[in-house]
Amino acid sequence: MSSALATQPEPAPVARVSRLRLTNTALLAGACAVLLLGPLAFGAVEPWSIFALEACAMLLLGVWASRQWINRELNLSGHVLFRPMAAFFALAVVQWLAGTTAYRHVTYTHLLLYAAYGMLVFVVTQTLRRSSQFDLLAKLFTAYGAVLASFAVLQGMAPNGKLYWIRTLEQGGYIYGPYVNHNHYAGLMEMLTPFPLVLAATHFTNGNRKIAAAGIAALMAASIFLSGSRGGMAAFVAQMAVLGLLLVRKREGGWKQPLMLGAFLALVIVFLVWMGGNELTRRLISIHSEAREEINGGVRLAIDRDCLRMLIKKPFLGWGLGTFPIVYPEFRSFYTTFFVNQAHNDYLQLLVETGLAGFSIAVWFLVLVFRQAANKLNNWTETASGAMTVAALLGCVGILVHSFLDFNLQIPANAALFYVLCAIAASNPLQESQRRRVVRRRSLIVESSPETAVS
């Protein structure tokens, strides 16, 4: 009897769940690697890096599908964003097949790129299911953001006009971090900064770790201002306004957490005063004068008007996904020696390329994101699902505000991370581990004990 018990194998369901969790974590780590290596490759804007992003996304999907085949079962989780994503992809396919696009090859290459975004979103939504994975994700984004922000600030203090101090630009640019365009660095930091900030504002860290998370978030936020991106500055202000509203709306804890947000902003200002110097002051002072210049007939306002004329020509299906730089010269209303490759307004460029049909699908997509996220905001400082939702949602808010002024969503590395954050914000609640539930219950008991004593 004892020998039989000694050789008894592990129950099949337990072993299967263990293997499933291990594979999910490996796939999630692979997706994070793709998302975080993209910015290091100059934003994944060159042919080789775009191919690498697409190939890695396809490889991750292939591994997920192979696991389903080996297990002889389809373990598929639905997601509310799959329908608008499929509708947008179908619209682009119609443009390509029906020949309504101005250049079929360009639309085809953008179809492949959007398919890669979809694959990454799919893999993340199928594998991010437990609170322990949120811990891994948040700490990974925090560490990555700290290293990248430190490098960007250091490079900004000792520039030589080259990427990584090594690669010479083929054309002009405003280098910051690994990006040719400082606005795109700011866009990346807008999406990463909320993760250490949320860690510092919730019960998922304590003591020195909470202080470290707040310090890292302050460094990342300060680097947005040091990059000189005015759109990034406006986006960060919008993010802090949303976070402030969420903290004030949360009744537990009184004014403690809003005061902590104020302390965080003070720390950001300290970083800026310490490292900013005259260049940051000049950029801040120029905001008002350049805004007035644009209103009085600047280049961006002229591009906006030209985009509206392009929309009138093809209002329903647009000119074709990715075709803006090809079609725009025909409608350009001003003289310039520069090549206008983007609209510098992601909303207008979406209208021009996909028409009212594509824009309506995008609105549908965003409405679902915010509606699903709103359902998980109760007690967001106490649950992994709520904290993850707020971090992802703040990142989305930053890019959505910045998109009025720049073209972050035309940069593959930034666009891929944005769509993944949208999917995370709109995902189903995470499964909290037993340890997390116990810790949360104890913290709630400790916080409620004074009231209990009074009663």
Map each language-model feature to its residues.
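Extracytoplasmic loops and strand-loop junctions of Gram-negative outer membrane beta-barrel proteins
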Residues: 104-107, 288-293, 383
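Alpha-helical transmembrane segments of multi-pass inner-membrane proteins
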Residues: 1-44, 51-65, 85-98, 109-127, ...
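Canonical alpha-helical transmembrane segments
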Residues: 61-75
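Interfacial/capping segments of alpha-helical transmembrane domains
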Residues: 52-53, 280-283, 318-319, 328
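Flexible juxtamembrane loops connecting transmembrane helices in multi-pass membrane enzymes
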Residues: 169, 174-178, 236-240, 258, ...
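Interfacial transmembrane-helix boundary/kink motif in multi-pass membrane proteins
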Residues: 75-83
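TM-adjacent membrane-interface loops and short helices in multi-pass inner/ER membrane proteins
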Residues: 181, 292-294, 299-341, 347-350, ...
